[in-house]
């Protein structure tokens, strides 16, 4: 498999060894995946926009920032300014507002990502799927704490 097709999640890394781990991964992967959870859409709180800035100091690889948040509008500009290359939002949080959200992401100079939970159908997002640069299909529903993998 081409390393450009591999995105590694940074959520589970050892934060005491960020620099060392990124230096090793930089040689093996094509992109980083950064989960931002707000504690509302998902019952967890994870990485922050400040960490994106730190990651960017150690790596030039693209960073896909996955907004697992109830209100992605509240985060888009902040994560773009922090250094996101791709901003991925959940279909469940943008229906009815998808075109405006994707226009804002594009205006900020980022690529547009869409995330589907296992029960979300492609049919439900067909009207704006053509606006998406990256599609992520979840194997668990992040809204269910300790959910089973589908």
Protein language model regions, located:
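Conserved N-terminal beta1-alpha1 strand-loop-helix module at the mouth
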Residues: 1-88, 93-96, 100, 111-112, ...
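Catalytic pocket-lining loop regions of alpha/beta-barrel enzymes
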Residues: 103
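Anion (oxyanion) recognition and catalysis
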Residues: 106
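Histidine/lysine/aspartate-rich catalytic loop segments that bind and position anionic ligands
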Residues: 115-150
